[in-house]
Amino acid sequence: MADVTRDAGLKQAAPARTEKPAADFGYVGIDAILEQMRRKAMKQGFEFNIMVVGQSGLGKSTLINTLFKSKISRKSVQPSSEERIPKTIEIKSITHDIEEKGVRMKLTVIDTPGFGDHINNENCWQPIMKFINDQYEKYLQEELNINRKKRIPDSRIHCCIYFIPATGHSLRPLDIEFMRRLSKVVNIVPVIAKADTLTLEERDYFKQRITADLLANGIDVYPQKQFDEDSEDRLINEKFREMIPFAVVGSDQEYQINGRRILGRKTKWGTIEVENTTHCEFAYLRDLLIRTHMQNIKDITSSIHFEAYRVKRLNEGQNMLSNGVADKEELAANEM
């Protein structure tokens, strides 16, 4: 009996075994997941869907071609008479495959001819809102499909560039109404179109007025403050937020300046270099949309805008189901 007690005491007194951290056994190779992800992404390619909205003649097609350095978006034809302006807003899209350094991207540009071109532009945002929601619905139905595809084609609008005419005054009621409504369902990036028509002083004043209008009307454009993930994100995004709206100039014409090939526009005052940040803010817009935030734009579309639509639609379906059950129970009670 004493031996049993002694053995039990020894067992209790035995020190707990300490596991060595995995790092002590040498290299594991967890970081290799990054290379695996890179190879998979390069093999599959990815999609980016960008919508451009603004009245005719603001250089929407030219800016898109300049952003991606490709003849992607067809130049819209300037109507010569009132009859040639579409009676309703048309939604047109064109898809272009781009490859750079082994990375493949399927770019879809959605244009909205007819927006803001009429005397009465009341509710002209509705067809655009419907189109955006239709893409969410299409994606949702694919997700709910029992035999859904391994990779669902993504036609959701990731970003909407909204073109503001360079009036030098303030936002029009049309601008405010459109951005106020659409910013709830899509990432809005406002730009001042053809900013070279303004002096630097006029441009700065116009940007200040627009910023004040956005704030006064509760319009939350991309990158939204509430989606900053950490202090590093906040620091980077704050710099972009201070530039919004981007004052841009687009051009797909190349010129030689002091032995350098540049994209630019020639005026009677000289050549405007599109990618020169002292001339315009095109380079900052390109950085935001392509070089630093493209994946984040897609993530916000999926986790915020599409998720809000998905929850709304599923709640609607649940309510319809509940109402249907209640109706059947009421009918059965009446029959009794």
Predicted regions and their residues:
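Generic recognition of flexible, low-complexity loop/linker segments
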Residues: 37-39, 149, 234-235
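Eukaryote-biased feature marking scaffold/signaling PDZ-domain proteins and nuclear chromatin regulators
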Residues: 23-25, 41-48, 53, 58-59, ...
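Short coil/turn segments at secondary-structure boundaries
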Residues: 63-69, 75-80, 120-125, 143-144, ...
